[in-house]
């Protein structure tokens, strides 16, 4: 049993928000996004559409399509992208890459992952050749979502390498989440000693963004890796500190409770672990994703919690 957090959900919102929040995007179309409200984003993009021409207009149109994909209106998203497609023959690299990304994202969200993969790969190739490093990193981040496994891990590594050396603000904004994914790929392969410095790098990168919740989750990941390395006292110290920080913020984190329980149990303190197993079960039992995806894990927490 791996005892990890659902990383695909952990950083998705922060990943998107970090793009929009970057100061470098003051005049960039990414700054018009409000990912939690696709309808509001559509209104912003339609207003912007009246102010731009040429390639910029095509880019905006791809983002309007994305607002429909996020609302799971895939047919409308594809219709809007169909309108863009014939205009790409004379367009520059940026609208072509954005078109490929949004077509791919629409297929992926609709469950057609096989159709999405070649589009993301082509987006990576075009963006890389054109020096559009932010869009290239975006493409590299999307491929693992549709392929997984060793191939997905390799694409994450490519994205990390490019983002690390890039001076592009969009690419740099993606680095924390990519580092998180890269670290978990190493961890999942049992390469704990290699994963630990990457987890630490991700923590530093998240804290640099000022996003405290994501910073705490990154520290949790460091501690989780320390547990895998058998460094229980260090891991427990971090989880105890996180417990206090979440409490000070008026929140409870079931994953922190779970780790404290596991660490106390691993160090021969089952009586101290029991109430933390119970708290973990109570908190994580409120999470619909956890209940659906981790039934055996939840059952174990409840059993150990008494």
Which residues are covered by each model-predicted region?
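Bacterial N-terminal signal peptides that target proteins for export
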Residues: 1-13
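Tandem amphipathic alpha-helical repeat scaffolds
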Residues: 27-34, 61-73, 97-111, 135-150, ...
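Amphipathic alpha-helical segments of tetratricopeptide repeats
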Residues: 49-50, 82-89, 122-128, 132, ...
């Amino acid at each position: 049993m791996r005892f990890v957090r659902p990383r695909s959900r952990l950083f998705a919102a922060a990943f998107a928000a970090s793009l929009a929040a970057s100061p470098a995007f003051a005049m960039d179309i990414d700054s018009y996004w409000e990912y939690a409200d696709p309808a509001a984003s559509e209104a912003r993009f339609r207003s912007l559409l009246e102010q731009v021409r040429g390639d910029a207009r095509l880019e905006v149109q791809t983002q309007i399509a994305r607002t429909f994909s996020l609302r799971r209106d895939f047919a409308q998203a594809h219709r809007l992208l169909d309108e863009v497609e014939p205009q790409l023959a004379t367009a520059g690299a940026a609208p072509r890459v954005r078109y490929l990304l949004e077509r791919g994202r629409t297929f992926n969200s609709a469950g057609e992952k096989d159709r999405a993969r070649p589009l993301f790969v082509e987006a990576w190739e075009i963006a890389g050749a054109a020096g559009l490093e932010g869009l290239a990193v975006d493409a590299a981040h999307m491929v693992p979502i549709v392929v997984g496994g060793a191939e997905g891990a390799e694409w994450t590594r490519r994205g990390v390498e490019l983002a690390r050396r890039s001076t592009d603000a969009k690419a740099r904004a993606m680095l924390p989440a990519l580092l998180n994914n890269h670290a978990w790929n190493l961890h999942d392969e049992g390469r704990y000693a290699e994963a630990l410095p990457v987890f630490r790098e991700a923590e530093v990168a998240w804290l640099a963004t000022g996003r405290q919740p994501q910073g705490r989750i990154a520290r949790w990941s460091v501690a989780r890796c320390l547990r895998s390395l058998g460094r229980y006292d260090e891991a427990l110290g971090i989880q105890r500190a996180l417990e206090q920080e979440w409490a000070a913020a008026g929140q409870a984190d079931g994953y922190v409770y779970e780790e404290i329980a596991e660490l106390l149990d691993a160090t021969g303190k089952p009586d101290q672990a029991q109430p933390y197993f119970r708290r973990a079960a109570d908190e994580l039992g409120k999470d619909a994703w956890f209940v659906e995806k981790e039934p055996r894990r939840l059952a174990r927490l409840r059993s150990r919690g008494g």
